[in-house]
Amino acid sequence: MLSFSHLSLADGVPIYQQILRYVKLGIAGGTIAHGEELPSRRVVSALLGVNPNTVQKAYRLLEEEGLILSHTGAKSTVVADEAAQSRVRGELLQAEVRDTIAAMK
């Protein structure tokens, strides 16, 4: 089961963005596999001490990107295939390059 416990409100990055990044890094790195279930929104919100709507926002964005599939009353499932893994790797690399360039300015 995935552990979101290392995410922090004190990080300065909105928690929904941290959740997005954590799941995307897991998909890109292969540590979160196709078919794996994500913890429920309530479990993650209780663990992080945030409103369930915050977790819902992250899960909704992941679903819009085609990385997870959600059904009412059921856990969300990762549906990222090799093409999605490759796409996520590219996105993360582009973000890293942007951040590095911004830090150099």
What are the roles of these predicted feature ranges?
Residues M1-E37, V43, A84, V88-K105:
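Extreme N-terminal segment that seeds HTH/winged-HTH DNA-binding domains in transcriptional regulators
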Residues E37-L48, L62:
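A short alpha-helical element within helix-turn-helix/winged-helix DNA-binding domains
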